[in-house]
Amino acid sequence: GAANVAANLANLDVHVYIGGVAGKDTHGDLLQDLLDSDGIDNSGVVISRDRSTITKMRILGDRQQMMRLDFETVRDVEQQEEEELISWLDSLCQKGLDGIVISDYGKGVCKDSILEKIFNLANCYKIPTIVDPKGSQWEKYNGATYITPNVKELSERVGYSITNDDDKIVTAAKEVLATNNIQYIIATRSEKGISVIARDGRIWHNPATQQEVFDVSGAGDTVVSMMMTCLASGLSMRLALHIANGA
């Protein structure tokens, strides 16, 4: 989840703040301890008394993930929880942030009203945002700087199956950019690497380096973390893309 992105950023020596909702339970306490151990500021984690902390159990065999069991409560956050999150983020924006990462897993935190307020704050303070999307309704991401779908997620958004070819990816991305207020689509393409399509028409392709992979869990989080770190540091898109792809 978002905590994995936060941990990746912290391991890159980035000062990280994390916001979200956890339950008042043992797993929630463990989450807070893990965040503390990575030096991540968790003051934005709202503790809910009527929601359990999302927990995932991975079943591995021969170094590969065979299946995953999720234990979770899926529903929109309460109004009070939303207000706490936005107040926390507003305070940070006033102090100064270099970037905002939004990890949407469709669990109820990234609802339309919260995202609208996040993008309004980010644009007001000129802070770049990068979104890891969920689902086919991307109108809620209008105002984002970057969005990082994989081929399957991009296919879901345009409503038809896309083959993993440069021209097909570019065509689909341009279709999305024409109907959504998003500046860049960063398409992660497995063995084909990463492609970036900008609203102004610029296109970058960076092929992947072939290597044996036993578990791709978290690969998208790695791309999000590296891209945000590089771009927030002022590196060019081409260099950021090269570094993120190599990670």
Question: Where are these predicted regions, by residue range?
Answer:
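Conserved phosphate/ATP/ADP-binding segment of small-molecule kinases
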Residues: K107-I203
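Extended, hydrophobic alpha-helical segments in both membrane/secreted and soluble proteins
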Residues: V101-I102, I118, T129-V131, Q137-K140, ...
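Short acidic, glycine-rich surface-loop motifs adjacent to enzyme active sites
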Residues: L92-V109
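A structural signal for isolated positions on well-ordered beta-strands in alpha/beta enzyme cores
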Residues: Y17-V21, G44, G99-V101, I130, ...
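Conserved phosphate-binding/catalytic loop of the ribokinase/pfkB sugar-kinase fold
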Residues: V45-R51, R58-K95
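Conserved post-catalytic alpha-helical subdomain immediately downstream of the catalytic base
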Residues: N180-Q183, T209-A247
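Substrate-binding N-lobe of the ribokinase-like
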Residues: G1-T55
